[in-house]
From Swiss-Prot:
Its cofactor is Zn(2+). Keywords: ATP-binding, Cytoplasm, Metal-binding, Molybdenum cofactor biosynthesis, Multifunctional enzyme, Nucleotide-binding, Nucleotidyltransferase, Phosphoprotein, Transferase, tRNA processing, Zinc. This is Adenylyltransferase and sulfurtransferase MOCS3. Its EC number is 2.7.7.80, 2.8.1.11. Coiled coil: none annotated. It comes from Drosophila mojavensis. Plays a central role in 2-thiolation of mcm(5)S(2)U at tRNA wobble positions of cytosolic tRNA(Lys), tRNA(Glu) and tRNA(Gln). Also essential during biosynthesis of the molybdenum cofactor. Acts by mediating the C-terminal thiocarboxylation of sulfur carriers URM1 and MOCS2A. Its N-terminus first activates URM1 and MOCS2A as acyl-adenylates (-COAMP), then the persulfide sulfur on the catalytic cysteine is transferred to URM1 and MOCS2A to form thiocarboxylation (-COSH) of their C-terminus. GO terms for cellular component: cytosol. InterPro entries: MOCS3/Uba4, Rhodanese-like_dom, Rhodanese-like_dom_sf, ThiF/MoeB/HesA, ThiF_NAD_FAD-bd, Ubiquitin-activating_enz. Binds 1 zinc ion per subunit. Pathway: tRNA modification; 5-methoxycarbonylmethyl-2-thiouridine-tRNA biosynthesis; Cofactor biosynthesis; molybdopterin biosynthesis.
């Protein structure tokens, strides 16, 4: 009787596994279809607004211009001709975050006649420490629109067009041609490749900036005869688990302000023909020591897939598929573990409430652990997991294969990396991560638990 029950259980289990696999396959197909429809919808929504109307061509400065821009007009290498070039120029800024805000602010203030602002996101409180065009009163509205409001307060003569939708392979080729210089102020790899390929195909200078923690980088791609493009330097995108954005790694607001202001300066230099443009070189900023380094980077790659004389890429592709990550700076949820190696926060909460013996490892850095932590969590930074220094510390718990170990992090990504590594050493142990991490805990278990 017991054997029959066991056989029935296995048969039912196999049926459920097959059903789950079928549903997952159907879900994946629907997800792909949804993505295609969303891209098409974005394209249709953008068609009526992407084209920059014919610009007014100015031949002289007004009295207001002379008064407003007098401090740069008297620069010997800039003068009236430089100001006229700025007044007749159009610059596209992709991303109105920590980099895009200062860049837009300085370009509008300097008298750039036309600005395009691209950002799909809305203002939220966590933006305000570094995204200086936005305010508390504008939380919840489009970042592009919020930036437009602030910029027109600075300079009402600047013509500003907002694109409050995600830049993609469809609308990029409609938006970008109308602009003279493109600023990459995004915070994700997929958009970097998208902008690079579009600018290379359309022969538009691309001023690229990045900032993370206390470090920043700046260069100009697709400029001049021998200037490299982004693909010349990075032909292959990094694996998703190796990518850290400011939402995960943090950033000091003054660092993004520094790099964003320098992006504006490089754009002005390109437009005016001022000084030596930062092409073929990269500026590296170390905020912790306040040091700048200027290093030479490789020239145009003869066999580059997009900017060589015989390119393999002549149109835009699916960059989320190419990079294996989303074209935004939101949570990029990794999928490194099998479902049975994960536990949802509700099930873990029940287990913890029932006081069942277990070990909860929090793999966030100590600075994040200090902000908040789950009850009974032990802080073991991911680096200590990866170098196996945790083994001796928890030798007693690891002796028993039955003693359950759970791993948690902020969003459920680092915890997967930790579990994956621990399972290589202890394959028979019960080691699982808390799915979606502390963000899920706040959402599903305790809404008063801090989220950051």
């Amino acid at each position: 009787m017991i054997a029959a029950t066991a056989d029935s259980f296995e048969i039912e289990k196999a049926k459920l596994c097959r059903k789950i696999a079928e549903l997952q396959a159907a879900l994946n197909a629907k997800d792909q279809k949804l993505r295609e429809l969303q891209l098409a919808a974005d394209n249709l929504l953008a068609e009526g607004e992407v084209q920059l109307a014919p610009r007014d061509h100015y031949t002289e400065l007004s009295n207001d211009d002379i008064a407003r821009y007098s401090r740069q007009l008297i620069l010997t290498d800039f003068g009236v001709s430089g100001q006229m070039k700025l007044k007749n120029s159009a610059v596209l800024i992709v991303g109105l975050g920590g980099l895009g805000c200062p860049a837009a602010q300085y370009l509008a203030s300097a008298g750039c006649g036309n600005l395009g602002l691209v950002d799909y996101d809305e203002v939220e409180p966590s933006n305000l420490h570094r995204q200086t065009l936005h305010t508390v009163s504008r939380c919840g509205i489009s970042k592009a629109e919020s930036a437009r409001i602030a910029l027109l307060e600075l300079n009402p003569h600047c013509r500003i067009i907002c694109y409050s939708n995600l830049l993609n392979s469809f609308n990029a080729m409609q938006i970008i041609p109308a602009y003279d210089v493109i600023l990459d102020c995004s915070d994700n790899v997929a958009t970097r490749y998208l902008l690079n390929d579009a600018c290379s195909i359309l022969q538009k200078p691309l001023v690229s900036g990045s900032a993370l923690k206390m470090d920043g980088q700046l260069t100009v791609y697709c400029y001049g005869e021998n200037g490299p493009c982004y693909r010349c330097i990075y032909p292959v995108p990094p694996p998703p688990e190796a990518v850290t954005n400011c939402g995960d790694g943090g950033v000091l607001g003054a660092v993004t302000g520094t790099i964003g202001a320098l992006q504006a300066m490089e754009a002005i230099k390109v437009i005016v023909g001022l000084g030596e443009v930062l092409a073929g070189r990269m500026l590296i900023f170390d905020g912790s020591s306040c040091q700048f380094r200027n290093i030479k980077i490789r020239g145009k790659r003869p066999n580059c897939h997009v900017c060589s004389s015989q390119p393999l890429i002549t149109g835009l592709i699916d960059y989320e598929l190419f990079c294996g990550m989303n074209a935004n700076d939101k949570d990029n949820a990794l999928q490194l573990l099998e479902p049975e190696q994960r536990i949802n926060v509700l099930d873990y909460h029940k287990l913890a409430t029932e006081k069942k013996s277990h070990l909860l490892l929090d793999v966030r850095p100590p600075a994040e652990f200090e902000i908040c932590q789950l009850p009974d969590a032990v802080n073991v930074p991911l680096a200590q997991i990866l170098d196996d220094s945790y083994v001796q510390r928890f030798a007693q718990q690891l002796e028993s294969k039955e003693y359950p170990i759970f791993v948690v992090c902020r969003r459920g990504n680092d915890s997967q990396i930790a579990v994956q590594h621990m399972k290589t050493r202890f394959p028979d142990h019960s080691i699982r991560d808390l799915e979606d991490g502390m963000h899920a805990w706040t959402k599903l278990v305790d809404q008063n638990f801090p989220i950051y």
